[in-house]
Design a protein with these regions (language model features):
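An N-terminal, well-structured beta->alpha segment
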Residues: 6-105, 193-195, 200-230, 240
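N-terminal small/polar loop signature for handling phosphorylated ligands or for N-terminal nucleophile
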Residues: 81, 89-152, 250, 255-310
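Phosphate-binding and adjacent anionic-ligand microenvironments
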Residues: 296-298, 321, 339-522, 529-533, ...
Length: 562
């Protein structure tokens, strides 16, 4: 089957000679042919993400055009002339092939008579979300693979509220994409004709200014004193966030910001880090070296598309401490609840089913509402829309994913590292003014609410074989349930595929033990990985740490021996 598909592509008149040469280069590598052609590159409810290359299971201009034709067909069917006139905003990051993919997206939409607003250069994911709202566009497309390795690129779709697509749009667009013939079903228009017909408009600096203007409004205490006294090292990890983040920090008065020069320029090869993910502490090597040199107490790093933020902060012994996504999330929650003025009675904070249970404790003990949604920031965006439409009672205060994604404000409907970086600088300054630090404030939260500690173990399983292994693990976990794990009785077994509470069905399994340990397993929606989440709690720090170490070993052993 996959060999037939390989031959079909090799014989296609649509491919250039260079593309055919790329295919010929793998002629003797059947495993690579299989991985490139055994299935269509999945266009799921989160869009599309995959390894760059030629093949129907690879990210390339043909799959980009197919996806965009499906999106165009859906827009025309669902919204008619109105949607065509409202148009689609397109942005792209610094990854390899991102510019070409953005242009192919634009030319396919124009070929279908749909107006396009294309950024004239690289921009962040949150600014794309903002642009959809600001331009009152029908939809948006972001060309990015976020923090994936350099071999990847991706395609994310947003709807008119600036959030990534959810149902009914998600299933409608997926069906429309699947119906498109990759070579013969696509309508294209060249750039010159699109501009002449008013179907292609380039956008840039005016939207940048408006975006920064709206981000500033979300500062909790914009007038905090001694901003010039806090020294911050900053890195965009070769991505797109340097311009907006350095600008916002400067305009807000943080004058002692030291960029990591080796990582400041956009470069899709990510030359200083194999994996440009701020969750990975190794990416902070250059940052902490610079911080030691200049005497900075905090390092901020963003992922390549500028929607996520990681930290390195000094502990009380002058050593670097790397708070995880949950720790940064609870820090935001506690800070906002204690420092934001005029919080409405129905103020609500939102996180996902795999984030720390400590979040709910903090929010509820401060008299506000905590909501949980499935993983994917689009579900947080969906709740914000429901609040605005009065379909749900609440006023959005803060949302986060444990994978270092945060949003304060409603100026965008996706995670935003620009606003998050600004507020992190504010928190660090506020704490320093009070004789404290980010590290100390995290410790205070644990001392106040209990030592709820977490770890996430991602296991990579590449290619067709890897996908089958992941599916086998999830199947076994559903079929072979145990009454106890690591000697602790199972209190509750939640299979989100069968439906839990009022959440949509999802491939997630969560086990709650009698001692309030949470064990969660899910396949990643964006990478060839299966993720194991462990969350333990105890009033004593040492006991909690020992419990976490034991369960890390026992839970993986449990999963492997199902």
């Amino acid at each position: 089957m996959y060999l037939d598909e390989y031959k079909k592509w090799l014989d296609s008149t649509m491919l250039s000679e260079d593309e055919k040469e790329e295919l010929r280069s793998i002629a003797n590598d059947e495993k690579e042919i299989e991985n490139s052609f055994y299935t269509n590159l999945s266009f799921g409810t989160a869009g599309m993400r995959g390894v760059r290359g030629i093949g129907k299971n690879r990210m390339n201009k043909y799959n980009i055009r197919k996806a965009t034709q499906g999106l165009a067909n859906y827009i025309i069917e669902a919204t008619g002339e109105t949607g065509k006139k409202k148009g689609v905003a397109i942005a792209y990051d610094s990854r390899l092939d991102s510019v070409e993919n953005a242009i192919n997206t634009a030319m396919t939409l124009a070929g279908n008579g749909i107006k396009v607003y294309l950024f004239e250069g690289i921009r962040s994911t949150p600014e794309l979300s903002f642009a959809v709202r600001e331009l009152k566009a029908q939809a948006g497309v972001m060309i990015t693979a976020s923090h994936n390795p350099k071999e990847y690129n991706g395609y994310k779709v947003y709807w008119e509220d600036g959030a990534q697509i959810v149902d009914p749009q998600a299933t409608g667009i997926v069906s429309a994409v699947e119906a498109v013939d990759i070579f013969n079903g696509v309508k294209l228009m060249d750039e010159k004709e699109a501009i002449e017909k008013g179907l292609l408009v380039y956008v840039g600096e005016k939207l940048d200014d408006r975006f920064i203007e709206e981000v500033k409004k979300n500062a909790i205490n914009p007038d905090v004193e001694n901003k010039d006294k806090i020294k911050i090292v900053y890195s965009p990890l070769h991505g797109v966030a340097a311009r907006p983040v350095e600008r916002i920090l400067k305009e807000m008065g943080y004058t002692s910001v030291y960029p990591v020069k080796e990582q400041e320029q956009p470069d899709g090869n990510f030359p200083t880090c194999d994996y440009a993910n701020p969750e990975d502490t190794s990416v902070f090597k250059l940052s902490t070296e610079l911080a030691d040199k200049v005497g900075a107490e905090i390092c901020i790093a963003n992922d390549p598309d500028g929607d996520r933020v990681g930290l390195a902060v000094l502990d009380n012994n002058g050593k670097w401490f790397f708070p995880n996504g949950n720790q940064i999330g609870i820090l935001f929650a506690e800070y906002i609840l204690n420092h934001k003025k005029n919080i409405p009675a129905n103020g609500t904070m939102i996180t996902t089913v795999v984030s720390t249970p400590l979040f709910d404790t903090i929010v509820k003990k401060n008299g506000k509402k905590a909501l949980r949604v499935l993983t994917g920031f689009k579900y947080i965006g969906e709740k914000i829309r429901q609040f605005e439409n009065k379909d749900l009672d609440g006023t959005f205060l803060f949302g986060f994913e444990e994978s270092i994604g945060y949003l304060v404000g409603t100026h965008v409907r996706d995670k935003d590292a620009v606003v998050a970086s600004m507020i992190i600088a504010e928190m660090a300054t506020t704490f320093k003014n009070n004789g404290s630090s980010i590290y100390n404030e995290i410790i205070k939260i644990y001392e106040k609410y209990g030592w709820r500690l977490e770890t996430t173990i991602p296991i990579t399983k590449k290619g067709k074989d890897g996908l089958e292994e992941i599916q086998k693990i999830m199947k076994s976990m559903r079929e072979k349930t145990h009454t106890e794990i690591a000697g602790i009785k199972v209190k509750e077994y939640r299979d989100y595929q069968k439906g839990v509470e009022d959440l949509p069905k999802s491939d997630v399994i969560q086990i709650v033990l009698e001692d309030e340990t949470y064990l969660t397993v899910r396949p990643s929606g964006t990478e060839p990985k299966i993720k194991f989440y462990i969350s333990v709690v105890d009033s004593d720090k040492k006991v909690a740490e020992e419990k976490l170490a034991k369960l890390e070993k026992e839970f993986l052993n449990y999963a492997e021996n199902l």
